[in-house]
């Protein structure tokens, strides 16, 4: 990875993390990402950003991992795990890497609490290659997916948020995340003055000066 690309990735990572540190912004994100059933099981009033220092360094070199925890509505612990990917050439094995993350989260929780939580994986993607070109079902990563399904059954694909496929109206539904997502979608192809104006409009409507500063730093 070139020094320029690595520096850009660090800026992206920091902007995404700083925004999701705000529980209200994290809630806006999850309100759009989770299915109605998942939302019915999650207590979104208990969202917390968790450390991910237990995740192996080899898994963290090319991705920014964000782990959000919350209680379920029946009082049990649960996790939402979001992975933000910055590679210009998407990796078709990302679902397998996310499986490793899921197991790492479970193992850490088992060590501390002697029980295994449900982990909901989400890939947030805004890479240069658009739209995201690969399946999100980890079984499709295998050399023989059909045989894999015979062994492992039909697995549900992981959730994907690809900003390049979202309309501006759809992005606005993410409220406090909208300004950052709009900027990520536009990338370097948009007019900077227009991007700044749109970002300010969105943060004035949904966010705060903190969110605005994050987006302006990103630009």
Residue ranges, per PLM feature:
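Elongated, amphipathic alpha-helical interaction scaffolds
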Residues: 1-219
């Amino acid at each position: 990875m070139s020094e320029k690309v690595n520096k850009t990735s660090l800026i992206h990572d920091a902007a995404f993390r700083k925004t999701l540190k705000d529980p209200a912004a994290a809630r806006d994100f999850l309100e759009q990402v989770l299915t109605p059933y998942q939302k019915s099981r999650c207590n979104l009033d208990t969202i917390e950003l968790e450390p991910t220092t237990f995740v192996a360094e080899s898994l963290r070199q090319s991705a920014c991992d964000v782990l959000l925890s919350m209680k379920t509505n029946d009082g049990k612990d649960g996790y939402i795990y979001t992975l933000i990917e910055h590679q210009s050439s998407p990796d078709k094995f990302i679902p397998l890497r996310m499986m490793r993350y899921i197991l790492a989260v479970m193992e850490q929780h088992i060590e501390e609490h002697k029980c295994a939580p449900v982990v909901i994986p989400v890939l947030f993607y805004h890479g240069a290659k658009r739209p995201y070109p690969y399946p999100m079902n980890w079984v499709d990563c295998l050399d023989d997916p059909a045989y894999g399904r015979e062994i492992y059954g039909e697995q549900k694909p992981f959730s994907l948020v690809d900003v390049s496929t979202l309309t501006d109206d759809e992005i606005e539904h993410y409220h406090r995340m909208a300004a950052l997502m709009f900027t990520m979608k536009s990338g370097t192809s948009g007019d900077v003055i227009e991007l700044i104006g749109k970002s300010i409009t969105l943060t004035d409507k949904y966010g705060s000066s903190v969110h605005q500063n994050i987006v302006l730093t990103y630009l």
